[in-house]
């Protein structure tokens, strides 16, 4: 290979390998060899004349760097940089980035990124040539070429005369041949849009067959292809076309602000919406070599200029929504223009193009009209001029056609858009490039129908795209045919042309001549048009290079004709188009202002329409009067004018009929179409000549009859007959035209069906190609899917194996965890049992100690009873001594009185000592009262402080009972040992409820015997009598002593009283300390001192005078004693209450008795209060017990719910294990049973097993025996063993035989975890896998085979009752 082309090392080998890997086809074609591949590539032609090899350089997806030292494609040649440029392949679209180095595409230097198109020539550096091939684009372009059309390569002629002035298809101004073009600055957006459109238009270069042979390439400096065209475009060569003038001038630069969107209404659009190409658009095919291209106006600058349908199917539907215009398609079908139109329509509607391929407007003006038959300027009374619209259609040029903008309809424009997309396309195509033909149509709205040449001033300048389009007309045919101009309206009412190919100037003169003869309102029309006839063939102004001047249109009002006739034929000055919708930005206020102006304009035009309709009616009335009043040779022509004005009025009243279709005037090309139209016109002319002859003869005969008539009475009848005949002739003419129109409609329907078939065929081919492509993609995806599924299956198998291994490991870990938990649970259970045992021992010890205390309390009670008896005996002795003392005192008094009387008032010498002894006996009594008061107050506060919860408030009746205390004090003086021995035990506290304390309280409460109580009451009942006498004596002797001793005695008493107070306080403090010291030991019954006076017990709080439990509590105050005291007082059954003593009682004694009765009543009331308080306390205790019971029930419920929740958690965990692991073991039906009275045989029989019918199992209430085959632990051998399940020993043992002499192994119940059927068949070489079950322990897994299925089920249910290895399954 040539070293200048490509290096053989490094990337070169890689590139060759890439090309060889792709589908590279070597095809022998005779003596040649064709190399073909499917990928985009560059064909290197070498760097100079010395290069001999041809290299294919593939362009892979992504970036490919080219240069003398590039890593991808290395080329050697003059002017090549190390990294000269790079080509980026992005999904089939290849773009060249020059990197600032010398690069040309098709001879044009490029300085910025440029898209590469099929067949373009690249020159890198000075002489390194590369051809770019894109097989996909080429294949797609070939598929788009219709059948029978070939696309020869255009001539590469850089030396053409005009090539210097053409860049990217735009003409630059030539000083010698062209007027200077306006230079407008382009915005960046417009430049980018123009550049994109240039690429799009570069992509579609095709030729029509035979064009190259008919016309040499040298005469076509322009590209023979433009814009997707397949339509031949060349400069005009006919004189008629060249007479237009400034056909090759651009009035403004491309995409200048003057080219408004609406000014290019007939410009072929990309798509109805003018949007960017969709993703389905294949790579566009560019032009190559020196093909110069036309840049059409982009769709972005035409917001609503196109009304074509979105899809061919929609377009075909829309084509039948309105009545077809037969004349239109009759003109277009049998000619090369028809082929052009069909292809243009397919180009527009094909979905494969994605709405991106512009339609080329074909100018048929190049065909000379040398064979056109001109009619005389004036034919008076000719019926052929009585057609409904006798106005010229063939004009010198077309008004600038604009699409119907939804926001503004410029005045004076003439529509080419139709409601049918097919007609729309035809009208648009034939209206863009017309240079010598005139396009007219019925008005789309009333304001268009009355605009004539006077509204041309309001038109903006022509779109530069139209101007550029005029630069590329069709090549002139060598044998031109007569060109016929005709238009048939879309409405079923035909409008026939009267001008058969005549020039617009001649026909304007003809109309003017007729107007003069018929007294037209514009009599000088011919004279005004004649002087300007020569100017029509000269150069027009640039703004009207495509035919801005026009005569009166068929919808033109007489006012416009008057303007024409008055000589106002000034050429309007080109103006900038203001208030265009495209010049309005996104500002909402400007849009609102724009719509307001448009609305006012529409209102003005509607008013003008109404005025013009009135004017037309006035003209009709004048014509009718004139025809009746006038006579002569011109009467035959009046109905023609009348009908014309009527048709004008009708068209003015029906503006909507013109909205549907555009009526195109154009010449036909092609021999067949020319002959057909010629025959049609010849037949119509023959009928017109016959009508003319008939009319002339009738006119002559009428004139002769008029001359020969004897009078004027027949003249009115003759006029009526002539008028009726003219009407009949008009109707006949219309019927003929209607018949011809129906024939043309038939032909048009056939042609349209053929066109539809061709469109569908092309669409079908495109869809088939897409289908094949997608099918291949589907096959590739299917292969990838199969490979992916295979890989996924392998990965899934690997993951499943890994998961199974992990599952086994997890299961082992779970077993170990469960074993640990079971051991911990067992240890916890053992510790709990030990604690319960120690608690029971402590409770037993407490109960024993309470019993001991009860015994001690009973002994203390007995001791107290003995002490009470002793005190009573001493009290009796004391009473007897006191009685003797009293008697002795009485005797002493008698002696003293006698001695006083005998001695004359001198006392005994020992009187003071006696008084001192009496004071010693009396003063401690006073101190004792204070001591009792202090003691009771101390006891009350101490008890209240010791038990504030359980003690009721102190009784109010006992607060000021001083007399009772005084009596008890005196009682204690009278019977000194008694107060110290009578005592009651301290009741147990309210918080204690033990039986021992209740027993001690009950025992101590009953301890005083009735006899001792009676003795005590006898001693007490005898107190008042002795007390009265004693007090009287004491009082008298005390007063005597006070008189004698005075202050000395008082001081002594105070001293002794203070000492007694100190002693009482010390004793009360000791008792208080003893009381508080015994307070915490509430179980102890002896909190008070052992010797306590019974009157103190009267003042104890009720809560301390009874036990805790109501059924065992006894009042320590003996109420029976008070009752007996009352009884003894009433009956007087005591020796101390003898009538002798009662006789000595004074009135003071009676008051004291009443006081004691009051005290008894108070005691009864206190007893009732004590009973009530006892009931209240019992109620409180009952409530406390009830609350305690409720609390225990709540705790039990919580415990049950907690245990149920724990059970649910365990079951859930088991279920999760079942779901997660494929080797999860089935749960056994029964949990272990540890009850000692559990009957194994009954349990098995209740489970549904037939124990008696199974001979392989010996079952009793505690033991199960039978033969099983067991697999060995170390050596996996199966041996028959005799198994014994013993619930007494809590073991599962197995022996060599049933004699149970040689023990082989023992399984303890606590080691058995689970018993389950071997559903996984994991036992190796099992004798019978269907009868194999497993016993899992902490250490190993036992496999056993039962002799029968029933035996296996029995053994499994038996062993599971001893499976105590899993403690969480137990309650």
Curated annotation (Swiss-Prot):
Pfam families per the UniProt record, alphabetical? FHA, PH
Do you know which InterPro entries this protein is assigned to?
FHA_dom, PH-like_dom_sf, PH-like_domain, PH_domain, PHLDB1/2/3_PH, SMAD_FHA_dom_sf
Q: Where is the composition biased (Polar residues)?
A: 157-175, 368-377, 547-559
User: What SMART domains does its record include?
Assistant: PH
Taxonomically, the superkingdom here is Eukaryota
| PROSITE patterns recorded | PH_DOMAIN
Signal sequence, start to end: none
Give residue numbers for the modification (Omega-N-methylarginine).
514
What region holds the FHA domain?
64-125
Give residues where Asymmetric dimethylarginine occurs: 131
* Chain spans, region Disordered: 153-182, 211-336, 368-573, 672-714, 942-1020, 1124-1143
Record protein name field: Pleckstrin homology-like domain family B member 1
- State the species of origin: Mus musculus
Q: What is the lineage of its organism?
A: Eukaryota, Metazoa, Chordata, Craniata, Vertebrata
Name of the gene this protein is made from:
Phldb1
């Amino acid at each position: 290979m040539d070293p200048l082309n490509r290096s053989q090392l490094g990337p070169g080998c890689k590139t060759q390998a890439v090309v060889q890997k792709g589908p590279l086809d070597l095809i022998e074609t005779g003596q040649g060899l064709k190399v073909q591949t499917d990928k985009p590539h560059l064909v290197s032609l070498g760097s100079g004349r010395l290069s001999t090899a041809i290299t294919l350089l593939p362009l892979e997806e992504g970036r490919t760097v080219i240069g003398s030292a590039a890593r991808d494609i290395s080329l050697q040649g003059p002017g090549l940089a190390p990294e000269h440029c790079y080509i980026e392949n992005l999904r089939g679209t290849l773009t060249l980035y020059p990197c600032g180095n010398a690069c040309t595409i098709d001879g044009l230097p490029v300085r910025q990124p440029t898209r590469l198109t099929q067949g373009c020539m690249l020159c890198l550096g000075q002489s390194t040539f590369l051809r770019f091939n894109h097989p996909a684009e080429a294949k797609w372009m070939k598929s788009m070429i219709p059948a029978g059309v070939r696309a020869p390569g255009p001539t590469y002629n850089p030396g053409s005369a005009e090539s210097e002035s053409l860049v990217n298809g735009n003409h630059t101004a030539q000083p010698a041949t062209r007027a200077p073009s306006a230079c407008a600055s382009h915005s960046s957006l417009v430049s980018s849009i123009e550049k994109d459109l240039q690429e799009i238009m570069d992509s579609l270069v095709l030729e029509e067959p035979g064009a190259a042979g008919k016309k040499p390439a040298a005469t076509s400096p322009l590209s023979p292809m433009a814009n997707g065209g397949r339509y031949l475009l060349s400069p005009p060569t006919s004189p008629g076309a060249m007479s237009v003038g400034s056909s090759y001038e651009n009035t403004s630069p491309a995409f200048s602000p003057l080219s408004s969107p609406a000014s290019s209404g007939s410009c072929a659009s990309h798509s109805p919406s003018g949007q960017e190409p969709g993703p389905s658009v294949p790579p566009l095919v560019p032009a190559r070599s020196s093909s110069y291209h036309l840049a059409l106006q982009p769709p972005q600058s035409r917001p609503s200029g196109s009304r074509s349908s979105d899809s061919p199917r929609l377009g075909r539907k829309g084509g039948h929504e309105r009545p077809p215009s037969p004349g239109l398609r009759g003109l277009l079908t049998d000619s090369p223009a028809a082929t052009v139109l069909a292809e243009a329509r397919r180009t527009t509607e094909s979905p494969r193009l994605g709405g991106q391929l512009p339609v080329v407007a074909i100018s048929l003006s190049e065909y000379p009209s040398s064979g056109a038959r001109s009619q005389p300027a004036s034919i008076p009374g000719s019926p052929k001029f009585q057609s409904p619209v006798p106005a010229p259609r063939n004009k010198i040029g077309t008004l600038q056609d604009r699409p119907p903008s939804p926001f503004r309809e410029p005045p004076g424009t003439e529509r080419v858009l139709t409601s049918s997309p097919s007609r729309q396309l035809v009208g648009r195509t034939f209206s863009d490039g017309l240079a010598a033909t005139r396009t007219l149509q019925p008005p789309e709205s009333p304001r268009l129908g009355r605009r004539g040449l006077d509204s041309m001033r309001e038109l903006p300048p022509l779109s530069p795209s139209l101007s550029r389009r005029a630069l590329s007309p069709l090549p002139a045919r060598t044998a031109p045919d007569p060109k016929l101009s005709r238009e048939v309206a879309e409405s079923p009412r035909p409008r026939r042309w009267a001008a058969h190919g005549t020039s617009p100037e001649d026909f304007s003169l003809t109309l003017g001549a007729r107007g003069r003869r018929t007294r037209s309102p514009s009599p000088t029309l011919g004279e005004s048009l004649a002087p300007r006839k020569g100017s029509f063939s000269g150069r027009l102004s640039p703004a009207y290079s495509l035919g801005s001047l026009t005569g009166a249109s068929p919808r033109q009002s007489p006012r416009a004709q008057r303007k024409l006739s008055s000589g106002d034929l000034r050429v309007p000055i080109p103006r900038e188009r203001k208030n265009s919708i495209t010049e309005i930005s996104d500002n909402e206020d400007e849009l609102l202002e724009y719509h307001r102006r448009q609305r006012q304009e529409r209102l003005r035009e509607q008013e003008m329409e109404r005025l013009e309709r009135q004017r037309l009616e006035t003209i009709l009335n004048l014509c009718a009067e004139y025809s009746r009043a006038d006579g002569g040779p011109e009467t035959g022509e009046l109905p023609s004018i009348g009908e014309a004005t009527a048709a004008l009025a009708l068209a003015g009243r029906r503006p909507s009929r013109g909205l549907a279709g555009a009526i195109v005037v154009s010449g036909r090309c092609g021999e067949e179409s020319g002959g057909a139209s010629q025959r049609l016109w010849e037949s119509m002319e023959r009928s017109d000549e016959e009508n003319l002859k008939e009319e002339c003869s009738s006119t002559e005969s009428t004139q002769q009859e008029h001359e020969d008539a004897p009078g004027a009475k027949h003249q009115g009848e003759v006029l009526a007959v002539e008028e009726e005949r003219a009407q009949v002739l008009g109707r006949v003419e219309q019927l003929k035209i209607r018949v011809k129109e129906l024939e043309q409609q038939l032909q048009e329907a056939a042609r349209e069906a053929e066109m539809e078939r061709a469109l569908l065929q092309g669409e079908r081919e495109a869809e088939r190609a897409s289908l094949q492509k997608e099918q291949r993609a589907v096959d590739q995806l299917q292969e990838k899917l199969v490979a992916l599924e295979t890989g996924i299956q392998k990965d899934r198998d690997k993951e499943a194996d890994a998961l199974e291994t992990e599952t086994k490991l997890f299961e082992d870990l779970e077993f170990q965890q469960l074993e640990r938990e079971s051991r911990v649970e067992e240890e916890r259970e053992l510790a709990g049992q030990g604690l319960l045992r120690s608690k029971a021992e402590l409770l037993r010890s407490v109960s024993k100690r309470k019993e001991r205390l009860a015994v001690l309390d009973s002994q203390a009670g007995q001791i107290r009873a003995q002490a009470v008896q002793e005190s009573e005996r001493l009290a009796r002795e004391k009473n007897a001594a006191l009685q003797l003392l009293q008697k002795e005192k009485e005797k002493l008094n008698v002696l003293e009185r006698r001695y006083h009387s005998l001695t004359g008032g001198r006392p005994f010498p020992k009187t003071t000592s006696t008084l001192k002894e009496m004071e010693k006996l009396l003063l401690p009594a006073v101190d004792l009262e204070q001591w009792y008061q202090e003691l009771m107050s101390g006891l009350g506060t101490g008890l209240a402080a010791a038990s504030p919860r359980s003690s009721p408030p102190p009784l109010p009746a006992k607060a000021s009972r001083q007399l009772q205390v005084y009596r008890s004090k005196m009682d204690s003086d009278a019977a000194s040992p008694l107060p110290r021995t009578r005592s009651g035990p301290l009741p147990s506290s309210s918080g204690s409820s033990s039986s021992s304390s209740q027993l001690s309280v009950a025992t101590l409460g009953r301890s005083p015997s009735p006899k001792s109580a009676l003795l005590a009451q006898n001693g007490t009942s005898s107190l008042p009598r002795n007390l009265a006498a004693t007090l009287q004596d004491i009082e008298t002797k005390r007063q005597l002593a006070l008189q004698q001793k005075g202050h000395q005695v008082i001081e002594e008493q105070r001293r002794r009283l203070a000492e007694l107070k100190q002693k009482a306080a010390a004793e009360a403090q000791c008792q208080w300390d003893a009381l508080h010291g015994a307070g915490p030991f509430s179980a102890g019954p002896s909190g008070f001192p052992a010797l306590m006076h019974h009157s103190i017990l009267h003042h104890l709080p009720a809560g301390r005078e009874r036990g805790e439990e109501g059924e065992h509590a006894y009042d320590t105050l003996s109420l029976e004693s008070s009752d007996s005291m009352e009884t003894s007082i009433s009956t007087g059954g005591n020796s101390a209450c003898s009538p002798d003593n009662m006789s000595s009682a004074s009135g003071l004694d009676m008051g004291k008795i009443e006081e004691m009765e009051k005290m008894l009543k108070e005691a009864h009331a206190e007893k009732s209060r004590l009973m009530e308080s006892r009931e209240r306390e019992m109620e409180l205790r009952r409530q406390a017990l009830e609350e305690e019971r409720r609390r225990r029930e709540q705790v039990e419920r919580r415990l049950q719910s907690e245990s149920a929740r724990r059970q649910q958690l365990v079951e859930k965990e088991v279920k999760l294990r079942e779901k997660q692991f494929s080797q999860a073991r089935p749960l056994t039906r029964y949990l272990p049973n540890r009850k000692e009275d559990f009957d194994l045989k009954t349990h098995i029989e209740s489970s549904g097993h037939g124990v008696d019918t199974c001979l392989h199992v010996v079952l009793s209430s505690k033991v199960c025996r039978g033969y099983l085959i067991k697999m060995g632990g170390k050596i996996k051998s199966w041996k028959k063993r005799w198994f014994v399940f013993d619930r007494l020993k809590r073991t599962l043992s197995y022996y060599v035989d049933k004699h149970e002499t040689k023990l082989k192994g023992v399984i303890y119940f606590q080691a058995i975890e689970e018993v389950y059927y071997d559903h996984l068949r994991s036992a190796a070489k099992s004798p019978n896998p269907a009868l194999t079950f497993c016993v899992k322990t902490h250490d190993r897994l036992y496999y056993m085979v039962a002799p029968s299925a029933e035996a296996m089920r029995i053994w499994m249910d038996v062993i599971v009752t001893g499976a105590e290895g899993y403690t969480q399954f137990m309650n």
